[in-house]
Amino acid sequence: MIGKGGFGVVVKSRNKLDCRYYAIKKIKTKGYTDSNQEPLTNKLLREVTTLSRLHHQFVVRYYQAWIEKSCDSFQSLEEGNEDLSGDLETDASEDWFMQSSINSRSIISRDSYSGLSTSNSNVGGANNTAGGGDSVSNANSNKSMIVGNNNKKLTLSSSNTSSSSSLLSNNKSKILNTSKSTSTNTSTSTSTSNTNKNKKISKKKKSKLSPLMKPKNKKNKNNGESEQSSSDSENGENGMKSRIIENASDSYSDDDNNNNNDSNNNYHSDNESDSFSGSISMSDGNGSGYEATDDEDIINNSGSFDDNENDDDDEEDDDDEYDEEDDDYETFDFQDKSRVVSNNSKLSTSSSRKKPPKETHTLYIQMEYCSKKTLKTLIDNVGGIAEEEAFRLLRQIVEGLNHIHSQQIIHRDLKPANIFIDNEQNVKIGDFGLATSGAPVSKSDDLNSSTSNAANNINLSSSTNSTAQQTPMWDLNDENLSMTGGVGTPFYCCPEILEKNTKHYGTKVDMYSLGIIFFEMCFQFQTQMERSNILRDLRDNLKFPPGFESTKPDQTQIIRSLLSRDPTQRPSTKQLLESGLLPSKMEDDILKEAIKTIANPTISLFSYLMEKLFCLSNDEHIMSRYLYTSNPSLTPMHLICREKTFSRLEKIFLNHGSIRIDTPTLFPKNPTNSTHPGAANVAKFLDESGTVVYLPYDLTIPWARHVVIHNIQQAKRYTFSKVYRRSQPGFSPKELYECDFDIIGPSKSRHISDAETLRIIIEIMEEFKDELFGNNSGSNSGSGSGGSINYKIRINHYGLLDSILSECGVEKRFFTVVYQTVAQLHWRLNWAQVAQSLKEHGLSASIVSNISTYFRQRGELAQCVTQLESLLANHKEATTGISDLKILVRNLQMINIIPRFLLDLSLIHNHQYYEGLVFQAYIERPTLSNPSRTEIIMSGGRYDKLIKSLHPNPSLSNNIVSGVGVTLACEKIVNSVLNYRQHLLNNCFNTTYTRRNKDPPNSNNNPNNNNLNNNVSIFTKFQSHIEVFVCSLGSSLLGEKLQVASQLWSAGIKADYSQTDYYSSEDIYSNCRENGIPWVVILREKAFQIGKLKVKQIETRQERTVARKDLVDFFLKSRKHNVDSKNIIQNTSSSDLSNLIGGINNSGSGGSGGSGGGSSMSSGGGGGGNSNIGGSDHHHHGHHSNQSTSSSGNSNNSNTQQTSPIQHHVHFSNTKSIIGSSGIISNATFSGGSSSSSNIIHFDEPTDSFSTQIVYQGVEEIKKSKIETLVQTSLSKLFRGFIQSKSSTIRVIVTDLAYSVIRDLQISESHDNISKFQRVSKEKLLQLKNQIFKWKVYPFIVIHSIKDDKSVIFNSVV
């Protein structure tokens, strides 16, 4: 063993395979089974997570980590009394982990002993605190002392390895009790004998334990005062001054270097073997232990620093400072009854209650092993560090920190003891126990990194005037230190953490620590008191020792900048490396000169360089890390919503005759890319030839290149593709989906293209209005038709901007500045910030006011164009812009979409390559904090200038085509669709039918009936691409589930099966609801053996048991069709349905105005024809008073002989229509007392089949069985909601003719139109005609096309 950390030990180990030495940290924790304890394990793994992302020459290398589980019972005596301090210094003298070897938590295993009793050890010298003192024992006896009550224990342990044991009392002991019972029972016997000795002990300055060491034990918080008073009185009787620890909030300071004691207080020695270290380990009632160990490890609540440097062994606990978030770890679990643990493994009490075995987890972290020493060892050496060596080490530290910060990691505990030195005298930054990942970086860091010349213009000197008058940080009270961020070692901790004057801190906290470290490297201290005083002056007032600034000006400048109290004034690692203040390495100079030569692509060495670069192999850690797969994975429902969103958008684009054209992913760097407004965030890469290539930042530039390269003259295209944003080095670029619609054409047609593009925007906003505004309150919620949808489209024309700026008095040299500043108005800055920025760029207040007058005005497009025409009449350059806008107004008025458009002169979007018309579609999302908040959904414009700039032959630029396009923020729309779906489904399943309802969902008595109908349509709208989900309960039944799924696949049913086990039906239903799956088939082992399956419909929550052989037929009958998929059937208008039913229900009449007279087969106008039924909820016509053989023809309101062919789907949700022997009867007031009620069969579900008679024409015999099922499904949807009498039969003719042919067919006894059809269809039509005449006695006939799977209702023929 080579070291001991805050949660475990570090051992030196040799791998049996490669025979190399490694440092392995072992951390032992409880085996948590409660999910609530998972965050604790995650915190414990923070160091592993941090180290795994780092791989640098000057950072301790991480290899791997693993966890082993074990069941701990009472350990053996040998195991339970492992001496962690006996040979510690011998090992530490050779190993770099020596700094973390001594100062650690209690060595007592929580599972080895059930409790600890109190024992006393007299303490003298400088380590006595408040009379009570710390308990110290030498290496020979290795005794420990426990201070505890029923809920809190304090373990004080120490080690001494040499003759310094004479300073201590080896055979005396003393008890510090915090409980009356403990005091009475255990300390009276020993306290008297120690009274005289105790009086000689000098008082020490007491301090409070910092928030870093406070456990989160909230129990017995109110018992502190009573415990203290009781214990104080008893200790007073024993002649001793004791200190009570209340809820582990108070501690002792053994590090103040008060040398006013007796001559025995000389333990601070130059001899390394005479060193001494004390440790305070605390545990609360829950077993959480916290330790105060080193002179630089605790920030005292009193505001003072423990600065004693008595540890010449350089012991620095490698995890000895803790954030509050680490205080939840439980490392010890003592019972109320306590014992003393001595070196010979004997317990001082006679009985101990055994604890049951507990599962423990041991985390192993394998790291690079470094021998030699630390930077602290070099600093403490006689003579210190040479100036040249100090700069070399500083550069290595900065390079290592630069890598750490580039991974968005803050070390937070940078100090000499945590900077190791390897065999080659190079730096290795280690101890990442307090490092935090993903901490917010200060804004100044971002600004500095994005500024090209920031490094050269860095201000590395800061005046002392800004800090000289400030209150020293040591004057802070207790409250000022009780902050979460209060971590790190005091002398190296930055002011913003100690003073709590900032909510977030970034990498600049490490730069402050670096300043203190560099000062220690440059200045040799003679005594510890001198070190303490000088560092205090340096931190408080930036006061250097006399002569330091004159003899070391470069070092002074660096230190002064690093120790600036303002974090924004401290340089970053990158700025410091490029500042020129650090002497460059010789190899750097050589490399820079070489790069100047080989960077020329025309020489052969350039190819050699590229070849070598691309021959590099990645480190195995990079291969195993997740850095290049860091884009978050999406839920299945998100992916489904994305596909459905793309499908809905695609329908709109296809409706306009566009085609999908994708462009190449990579394209070379060019001047247009470099001037792009988002150029800083473009993802750039190098190919093997040394060409810089870009991933697309947007889809406009790649498309414009495609148009120019392929000489496209006319095109209307759309695309869905990814765009990318640059991430931190070593991470995948951020991926986003974008959709573009573009029109390329001749210049003369550009105005029509502009209007069509704006029409596309309107159609998209209307298509997604429910999703975009579904969560809004008021009239904007719901379907969107009842209230005004608050979206607008702002328009501007760049041809007007120059004229307006000239009108405002802006000089031309400021035009670009104004455009760039105003461009941020609608998404980053408000107008006050824009005005301030313009003033900072040199524009006068009056000019800014004039600009505001124009740019802040917006209004209705047509009206504003008229006003601008008169206002800019004297500016010739505005003529083109005014003319284009007037034409646009006319075109928008022609297609009746003008009211949605506003003219907004402040709209400036991608001015680098857009010219002419630009536009943006936005929605208003006001909040309490920002009532004018808007969100941009689409933007675009005319990019003729971009196409010209990419053209290889500028002389032909006048013949170049023009282009206009719109870009959609797909992710915003997809997220809106997803959120809207979740919102509706949450409401849907809260109001749907449950088993507790007495009436079924279809019953009129069920109050949830209307909600259920709405919810079903909602569920269908967001239905998954999977129709049936096959799963099992109890047993896995993987093979059986595959068989059932295969059975469904063979019938064309979209199905999937679960590969995981479910133990609850509710889990299955919940999964289906979340993923929009309408049906679930549940297999149980015993039921499956007899061929029975359980089927449940998720939307109605109805269950039934189905035989396996009937499963396919069941789903073919019951299949629900998603409104977003290609429906087999389509809805019709309510007027067409009314005409049909009205004509059918006119018993004995000739239709509405027809001439059929009293014919029982009247056609309503003299011609029999076909008609289809469409969906309608309103068809209340007259009652059918008798059951005579009356019939109806195809009548309509226009009283014409022509029939309107209508597609066949109908769904009656709240009506009762009867299919009887006389035809279709609409009976809105049907009741049980009706004369026909006894003959009525009510079908609760559309899956029940109607009574039919089917005649097949042109159908193979083998296919008739399957076709019959399809026909039944079609009829169930066609007559959904109808009631069929027992005596009625629906006649169906199944033919292989196309639906379009059947739809156009007209037949009567006097004439037909068969002659107009092609010869191929005539024979089949004649057969169909003959069958129709055979069934002319029936009121209607259903003709079903198996070719298109659609049906037509054909009325009677006369």
From Swiss-Prot:
Record SUPFAM superfamilies: Class II aaRS ABD-related, Class II aaRS and biotin synthetases, Protein kinase-like (PK-like)
Acidic residues bias locations: 306-333
PROSITE patterns hit by this protein: PROTEIN_KINASE_ATP, PROTEIN_KINASE_DOM, PROTEIN_KINASE_ST
InterPro entries per the UniProt record, alphabetical: aa-tRNA-synth_II/BPL/LPL, Anticodon-bd_dom_sf, Gcn2, HisRS-like_core, HisRS-related_dom, Kinase-like_dom_sf, Prot_kinase_dom, Protein_kinase_ATP_BS
Sections of the chain in a coiled coil: none
Residues that coordinate or bind ATP: I2, G3, K4, G5, G6, F7, G8, V9, V10, K25
Entry EC no(s): 2.7.11.1
Pfam family for this entry, one: HGTP_anticodon2
Annotated Gene Ontology cellular component terms: cytoplasm; cytosol; nucleus
Biased segments, Low complexity type: 149-196, 258-285, 342-351, 447-466, 1185-1199
Active site: residue positions: D413
GO terms, molecular function: ATP binding; eukaryotic translation initiation factor 2alpha kinase activity; protein serine kinase activity
Gene3D superfamilies: Anticodon-binding domain, Bira Bifunctional Protein, Domain 2, Phosphorylase Kinase, domain 1, Transferase(Phosphotransferase) domain 1
Residue ranges of every copy of the Protein kinase domain listed in the record: 1-582
SMART domains reported for this sequence: S_TKc
Keywords: ATP-binding, Kinase, Nucleotide-binding, Serine/threonine-protein kinase, Transferase
Biased composition (Gly residues): 1148-1172
Region feature Disordered, mapped onto this chain: 125-359, 445-470, 1148-1204
Biased composition range(s): Polar residues: 136-148
Mutant phenotype after disruption: Subtle morphological defects such as an aberrant stalk structure; due to the redundancy between ifkA and ifkB functions. Cells lacking ifkA and ifkB display severe morphological and patterning defects. Mutant cells aggregate in streams that give tightly clumped mounds. Fingers form from the mounds but remain attached to one another, especially at their bases. The fingers culminate to give fused and entangled structures lacking proper stalk but containing some spores.
Reactions it catalyzes: L-seryl-[protein] + ATP = O-phospho-L-seryl-[protein] + ADP + H(+); L-threonyl-[protein] + ATP = O-phospho-L-threonyl-[protein] + ADP + H(+)
Entry's family note: Belongs to the protein kinase superfamily. Ser/Thr protein kinase family. GCN2 subfamily.
The protein's name: Probable serine/threonine-protein kinase ifkB
Source species of the chain: Dictyostelium discoideum
Organism placement in taxonomy: Eukaryota, Amoebozoa, Evosea, Eumycetozoa, Dictyostelia
